[in-house]
Amino acid sequence: MPGNVSTKMDEKLKFVSRYLDGEKISALCQEFGISRVTCHKIIDRYKDSGLEAFTDRSRRPFRQANHLPFQVEQLIVKLKKEFPTWGAPKLRDRLHTHYPDIALPAKSTVHAVLDRHGLVKKKRGRHHPKLTGTNLSDLKEPNALWCVDYKGEFMLGNKQYCYPLTVTDYASRFLICCEGLESTREAQAFTVFEQLFKEYGLPGSIRSDNGVPFACANALYGLSSLSVWWLRLGIGIERIKPGNPQQNGRHERMHLTLKQATTKPPAKTLLQQQDKFEDFIYEYNYERPHQALDMKKPADLYMPSARKYEGLPDVSYPFHDKTVTVTNCGRICLDGKKIHFSTVFAGHDVGLRQVEDDVWLVSFMDYDMAYFDMESSRVQALENPFGPKVLGM
């Protein structure tokens, strides 16, 4: 069956669920890419043994970390339809009373299941805009989109490694920055970008790959402290798909030219190498014509952004019950409870809104991020508001 994320067992469970909802077999066969013979085998196995038929033959455990079993999720949905006015706490209690053998999910998990199935009534008057995420834009105006990357490390003459951080303007090809750094550590990148924002203003969006420090594999939605800072400044984030550097093709072509002109051979020291980068920047922007620009030079088209950098703007949450500052260790402190949220939001204000008894919604700026419940202190992420979830929580 198709799908490179879900296992075969997941696909069969989805197939059976939709069959039970009354969808036609022919349409399901076509969508799942299976024959009618295979289709009827799956249905017959279900009729003989129920969902356990798939569980028994699967090598996957019934319950995985951070993954609610399919059967439990379906029970929650079924209970909600039986008791449409009940919220997560009452449904959870019903689960505990009538299905005592089931590992009881947290209230926030129950609420997230209801939300995922469209069974949570949304309050009016609240709009949740979304970033383009991995939907890549093709913008024509200077500073609408910057492209960033590290031009792979290379060794200098003194055996020290150099990590060039490069930034280009997408529309004009203007090479805004090529800064030789000692590492890809976040602190150094912060310093470079703050200086760029002061000198050139703020872009509309920044496109990057999924590497450090632009993303963080273990953080909520793959965000990093750097990308959270960009969001606070009103800068959108775009990410190319993993293993698809051609999606940042203009930037990659510049890297080829940069490598040929400045690293063969490399300079002896980092300062001397930076001199080579500066010479290249001037030539690339002011002397070298570009065929894609009708033989114009990037400097002929580029101008600094009208959006000035003035530090982090204030953020407020008028539609929420509380505003709290995430601690340096990534916690939300509420009524004596310490909820581990994410360290990438350390020092930033988030909005909290109570949606059920003991269940709270966490929002960052205009983005709803997660639920947590006070009883278990467990956080349940919502659907990624920045696009397809490239990196897990």
Residue ranges with predicted function:
Residues 197-220, 241-243, 248, 294-298:
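Acidic/histidine-rich, metal-coordinating catalytic segments
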Residues 226-310, 351, 355-358:
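Charged alpha-helix within mobile-element recombinases
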Residues 281, 285-393:
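C-terminal, beta-rich DNA-binding module of retroviral/retroelements integrases
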Residues 15, 29, 39-42, 50, ...:
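Mobile genetic element proteins and their domesticated derivatives, centered on retroelements
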Residues 51-147, 153, 224, 297-307:
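Basic, flexible linker segments flanking DNA-binding modules
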Residues 1-14, 62-70:
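Short, Lys/Arg-enriched anionic-surface-contact patches
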Residues 70, 112-168, 172-175, 182, ...:
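Mobile-element integrase/transposase regions
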Residues 7-23, 73-82:
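Short, amphipathic alpha-helical "recognition" segments used to contact nucleic acids or chromatin
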